[in-house]
Amino acid sequence: MGSLDAKPAAATQEVSIKDQAQLWNIIYGFADSLVLRCAVEIGIADIIKNNDGAITLAQLAAKLPITNVSSDYLYRMVRYLVHLNIIEQETCNGGVEKVYSLKPVGTLLLRDAERSMVPMILGMTQKDFMVSWHFMKEGLGNGSTTAFEKGMGMDIWKYLEGNPDQSQLFNEGMAGETRLLTKTLIEDCRDTFQGLDSLVDIGGGNGTTIKAIYEAFPHIKCTLYDLPHVVANSHDLPNIEKVPGDMFKSVPSAQAILLKLILHDWTDEECVNILKKCKEAIPKETGKVIIVDVALEEESNHELTKTRLILDIDMLVNTGGRERTADDWENLLKRAGFRSHKIRPIRAIQSVIEAFP
């Protein structure tokens, strides 16, 4: 009679309208990024900035690169951008007319801004980069290729090498992210670079980071190191040596090696390989590897934790890499033969990890 005498299971907790709304918001999460993309494509932020003061909807419509603009369509888009806290909405003429201006985050949508995120927005939301997210299930098997490779038939690096326009957009996007990050890196970690006589920026893209470091520390002999097709398209960099190559095969010798936003792209085995090459390239007594990457705190309620977890999923889907915890970094560096390391939080999503041979 056991089952008959058992007390009934507690009733399932009732689902609230708030729960449903949360799930709707998640389902339509792509609306945020694609409304943002549309705003960038038609130059809404630039039009607002170039206007003399706040702009009305009619003024905005008149300046769009589109004929016969639907005022209702535009209003609903702008209303959503207001909800996303990208655009500020105010009223004038006794409250009968709405006018719009940019909030601070909206300035990142300006094409000519030093820290513009326009290339990153356009690159990450273009169709090819959206395909991989539909192949997450196929990536679950052990030993499987990435979701990107499942969807596109090649890994992300082969794709970028074979698509110069997308490669340029990717590197411009990274450069925009890099400008803000590098400024913070230099301001918060001057002692990391002072005293160095030479530095190689591995996977340095178009040279934005190494150029800023050289300008801040002109006594350092600086080298940009990346794949041949990337180096060929890098900025003009006076006083900085450019070396094409493959970090999995060799790394130029220097007192210090910089790996900024590199290791999160790769598996642990690949990272150990890269780090061993870096260790071989630096002097045992005075050398170091400077890693700039996320140090993930999985249980933290920090305001940046969700962003860091999103970046981890991005790595999972597109590169096969990961964002790592402090323990992950310790294990990785020990496997690569480094005797010690220290992790320093900075005013950024990433931290600075200095590893000593």
From Swiss-Prot:
Pathway: Alkaloid biosynthesis; (S)-reticuline biosynthesis; (S)-reticuline from (S)-norcoclaurine: step 4/4. GO terms for molecular function: 3'-hydroxy-N-methyl-(S)-coclaurine 4'-O-methyltransferase activity; O-methyltransferase activity; protein dimerization activity. Gene3D superfamilies: Vaccinia Virus protein VP39 (3.40.50.150), Winged helix-like DNA-binding domain superfamily/Winged helix DNA-binding domain (1.10.10.10). It comes from the Eukaryota. Induction: Up-regulated upon fungal elicitor treatment or wounding. Expressed in roots, stems, leaves and flowers. Keywords: Alkaloid metabolism, Methyltransferase, S-adenosyl-L-methionine, Transferase. The keyword Chloroplast does not apply. It catalyses: (S)-3'-hydroxy-N-methylcoclaurine + S-adenosyl-L-methionine = (S)-reticuline + S-adenosyl-L-homocysteine + H(+). It is an enzyme of class 2 (transferase). S-adenosyl-L-methionine binds at D226. The active site is at H264 (proton acceptor). Optimum pH is 7.0. The keyword Methyltransferase applies. Its EC number is 2.1.1.116. GO terms for biological process: alkaloid metabolic process; methylation. Optimum temperature is 40 degrees Celsius. Homodimer. Involved in the biosynthesis of benzylisoquinoline alkaloids. Catalyzes the transfer of the methyl group to the 4'-hydroxyl group of 3'-hydroxy-N-methylcoclaurine to form reticuline. Can also use laudanosoline and, with a lower activity, 6-O-methylnorlaudanosoline and norlaudanosoline as substrates. Also involved in the papaverine biosynthesis. Belongs to the class I-like SAM-binding methyltransferase superfamily. Cation-independent O-methyltransferase family. COMT subfamily. This is 3'-hydroxy-N-methyl-(S)-coclaurine 4'-O-methyltransferase 2. The lineage of its organism: Eukaryota, Viridiplantae, Streptophyta, Embryophyta, Tracheophyta. The gene is 4'OMT2.
